[in-house]
Structure formats: C-alpha cells, structure tokens
Curated annotation (Swiss-Prot):
Pfam families: DNA_primase_lrg (PF04104). Belongs to the eukaryotic-type primase large subunit family. One of its GO terms (cellular component) is primosome complex. This is DNA primase large subunit PriL. GO terms for molecular function: 4 iron, 4 sulfur cluster binding; DNA-directed RNA polymerase activity; metal ion binding. InterPro entries: DNA_primase_lsu_euk/arc, DNA_primase_lsu_PriL. The keyword Metal-binding applies. It comes from Sulfurisphaera tokodaii (strain DSM 16993 / JCM 10545 / NBRC 100140 / 7). It comes from the Archaea. [4Fe-4S] cluster binds at C222, C279, C288, C292.
Length: 306
C-alpha cells in the first residue's frame, strides 16, 4: 500500500488528523493566533486567484495542509460565489496537472481513498484508421454501474464520456489515464465545493475576523458614481450588471433591470461570459473617477489582501 502525499493533496487529510501533530487539544485558531504565517499564505493565494495568476502546488508550500484549510475557510467566510468558483477552478487545474504526472499505482490509491473503486488492468485494443492498424493502451477500468455513477455529470458536458465511446467487457468499462484523471478531478472538485459551502462548519475566529475586515471594504468609487446616476447608457449599465454578478449580488441586478433573465445572460455560458472591465479599460471609457491603485474595481471591493 502506497503512502499518500498529503503535502501535494492536502484536502485528502482531515484537519483534525493534521492538528494531532501538535500539542494535544490545539486548534487551528490557536495556531493562527500564535503567528501570521498561515493567514499570510491564505491571503496571498486568494490574491493570486482574484488576479488570475498561477498558483503554486501545495507541496511547494511549508505546512501545506494547514495552509490549505486556512485558505479554504477564508474563502468560505468571504462567502462570495464568484470567488468560490475561481478558487475551485484554480485548485482543480493544479490537481489535474499533478495527477497526470502520478504513477498508475498512485492514481488507483488516490481513487480508492476517495471511494472510487478503480482497477488497474492494462489491455491493448487494436483498431483500424485510414487503412492502418493502430493500438490503444487502456490501463484502467471501472465497474459498469460505477462508470455511470461517476460520469453522470461529465456525460452532460462531454460526449467523450458516453458509454458508446468506450470498451465494455465483462461488466467493466475501460478508460485511459487522461479519462481517469478527469473523473478524479471532477470528484475532487465536488468534494472541495461541499467543503467550501458547508454552512455548519465552525470557522476559526481569526479567519472570521479577517473575512469581516476584507468584506468591509467600500464599493469602488467608479461603481458608486454609476449607482448615483439616474440614467445609464448601455456601457454603464453593462458595467454595473457585471459588477453585481461578480460580487454575487444578483438581487441588485434584478432590481436594476426588472428582468430576471438578465442574470443568466450575463453569467454567460461555455462560449460567452461577461466580466468586469479592468481599471485601465474603465479609464479609456471615461468611467474612472479616482486613483485607487488597483488593477480592477473588484480588487478594491475585496481588498488587496495586504
């Protein structure tokens, strides 16, 4: 049995188990009170998420399990849908990259740890393409029922996961490494989403205080100016709607437009998504009214996390 690398995949290790490494009875809040390292790391990570910068893999960070939970709880405490989505997207990207570099045995171990009964039993499939005989190595398999269960949502968004696209033999569906990783990432993302959305979790006081401080930031001056105007042109209206949606205030969008469908339109789909202009673009449009030293109005709203 392999030993899982919790430094690289900290979400696999319960916080309580990590805290046992310290003095008996110590809590995460006790550690946060004793020093600023974990909060500083969490703020830096969230700042990078908001600025769409590349994140480090957790195994490059000291005490990665505690940094992960501090970041997770801070995102939960800030309670913003846009931030949660960006957090999940960014973390999922790193996880996928790491999993693709893992050995077959490690992937199976991680899958089993998550409750996915994935088997490693390599088979070679011969097929013809353009009159040439080619071979495909399928190293993993899932029980037919488990395949349908774990790919239920994936099949809605990606035809590659339809049963018709796979080899079914002796009650098993055979898969490539890339497909297994995709399934794992989807399951892990769902696990993280549940963790960040749990309402009854006790968020450490130090994290709650920081979140309250960050949420207390004022509305950007440019947005305040637009809210004061009695009449808005199409560009100004679009900016205000995008701002409300990005901060998770859909009610204000409906109040402003009297149209419940506008939220769905501006949230976009796979091909189209509306985002708030950068401060540079706001200046070009003549909508900037103050020097805030930020790159985007949302940075003013969430704070610079400094």
């Amino acid at each position: 049995m392999l030993i899982l690398d919790f430094r690289k995949y900290p979400f696999l290790k319960p916080l309580e188990d990590e805290l046992k490494k310290y003095a008996g009875g110590i809590s995460l809040n006790d550690l946060l009170v004793s020093g600023s390292y974990y909060l500083d790391q969490a703020k830096e990570r969230i700042d990078k998420i908001l600025k769409d910068k590349e994140l480090e893999s957790y195994d490059k960070i000291k005490d990665s399990v505690l940094v992960f939970y501090t970041t997770l709880y801070l995102v939960a405490a800030l309670d913003n849908d846009m931030l949660k989505k960006k957090f999940l997207d960014k973390e999922s990207q790193i996880i996928e990259k790491n999993l693709l570099n893992e050995s077959e045995e490690t992937l199976v171990e991680i899958a089993n740890y998550l409750g996915l009964n994935i088997n490693y039993n390599n088979i070679e499939i011969k097929y013809k393409k353009n009159k040439k005989t080619l071979s495909l190595s399928l190293k993993y398999s899932l029980n037919f029922i488990d395949f349908l269960k774990y790919t239920r949502e994936l099949r809605k968004i990606d035809n590659k996961f339809s049963l018709a696209s796979h080899i079914l033999k002796d009650g098993k569906v055979y898969l490539t490494k890339e497909e297994i990783v995709r399934i794992l990432v989807f399951q892990i993302r769902d696990k993280l989403m549940k963790m960040v959305n749990v309402s009854d979790v006790v968020i450490p006081e130090q994290i709650r205080k920081l979140a309250d401080e960050l949420k207390g930031r004022k509305t950007p001056p440019c947005i305040l100016e637009l809210k004061r105007k009695k009449e808005l042109n199409n560009t100004e209206l679009g900016v205000l709607i995008a701002y409300y949606i990005d901060i998770g205030d859909e009610k204000s969008v409906i109040d402003l437009t009297k149209d419940e469908n506008i939220v769905k339109k501006f949230k976009g789909d796979k091909k189209t998504k509306y985002i708030l202009y950068s401060c540079k673009k706001m200046k070009e449009l003549g909508l900037c009214v103050a020097s805030c030293n930020t790159l985007n109005p949302l940075q003013f709203y969430y704070g610079k996390l400094e």
